[in-house]
Each structure stands twice: as structure tokens, then as C-alpha cells.
Amino acid sequence: MPALADENIFAYSYGSETLPKGASEAYVWITDRRDKNLGEYNAQDYQLEVEHGLDDNFQGSLYLTFQSNHIKGLSPELGDIDRNFAFNGANGSLKWALSSPYTSPIGVAVYLEPGFARYNAKSGERQTKLFLESKLLLQKNFMDDKLVLVGNITAEQEFEHEGGGEWESELELEGSTGLAYNIAPGLHLGGELRYTAAYENFPNEFHRSDYALFAGPAVHYTTRRWWATLSYQQQVAGGPDVRSRNLNLADYTRQEVRLKLGYNF
């Protein structure tokens, strides 16, 4: 069974396909992030999403996000946090498919997602964040659509402040790729590679303040209406934190696990 329109074969990387006009999809994301260089750190990100095909090559989505944080001894400047499933924010997105990998040499889509968040994803501290995420999505299918290769380039401009402080700006750049093979009807096995970096005080400055590289396996299973995707990501390189032997465990975690469950209707 080849990949279906807008099927989430990967947990972090997106394909270029959209839902058909009038089709809808509901799904939940659960991401578990653990292990930093100091103290105890585990955080869970939750996302509830409804997606709808507005046209055969254009879709829209609405999201609600929630967050749990259990942090102790992370930094002398930060207090301990014990938070369970708190409302974090809301996002909306639009995705426009310019070409399909099933009818063209390569599938191309563009994606825009504005939103806001109430908690800092790295520290768990209370904040106000506004952001606009943009993506270029590429997809190439091989071997009668059984082998799927995707690539994403993402830029997210953020504006945030904590308490009564001044607004600060940051640019996050990410590049990711995923490769998966349809080994049996409805079952894809593959892996993902993801590079992410932050540029503080952008656009006034363009200087990379931190980065990390993650890699790991992904498995996807789909039926006529239900599907599930599970991915494990291990940090394999990072900087500029020199205390963790070429890993950046001050700004990012050592490992992430993401589960996505979806229903088509």
C-alpha cells in the first residue's frame, strides 16, 4: 500500500501531499523529551489537531497545544517546575501543494503556521511567545511509490517575553529529511535526520547561538481510517555547550520520542 494523501509517514518531517477537497483528519501528537546535562529534566508536549481539505491541493489546520514539565536542578537561575498537562497555546496552518510526487518528478509544497505559546519549550518557564513558521516541503517517491524520501526546510520567527520584561526575538532554522520503505501493506519502516539551530536577536543580528543534530528510526502503520507513527530521536551532535562532549544538553535534550495517532473522516 503506497502512502496516501497527506499521510504522516514521519513524526518530524512532512510530505508534500494535501488532503483531498472535503476530506478531514483529526490527530494527536505526544512528544516526550528527556535528559539534560544538569539536574532532572523530562517534558511532554501534546498537540490536538483537526485538518481539512479546502481544495484538492490546499488544506487548513487548527491546533491546541498542551505541555507537562518536571524539572529539578536544571539551573541556579531557574526554579524547579512540576506541571501536569497545562494549556500552552494555539496554532493554525495552511498548506499548498504545488506539485504531486505521484504525477510529477518531485512533490513540492509550501506551509505557513502562525501561533502563540504560554511556556518556554526548553526551560518550562512561563512566557508569552508569538511565532510564524514557514516550510518548504519536498517529496520524491521511488520503486512504484514504495520508497518515500522527504526533505523540509523550516524557518520560524519568534517574539517572546517573560513577566514584565522586554520583547526578545529569535529565529529558528531547521532542516530535516526522512526515508521510509513500504515493507508490507500499510506498514512503513524508515528513519529521520534533523538539524535545528537558534539565532538570537534576529533580524538585528544573524549569529547562531546554539544547534543540535538528531537522528533515529521511524515506523508508520495505517488502515483505511486509522494510522499511527512512532519515532525515536537521539541527539548525535550539538553546540556550543562544551561540557557535554560535543552534545548540546543545555539547550536540547539527549533524546525525544514522538507518537502521532490519526483518524480520517
Regions found by a protein language model. Give the residues of each.
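Transmembrane beta-barrel domains of Gram-negative outer membranes and organellar outer membranes
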Residues: L4-Y263
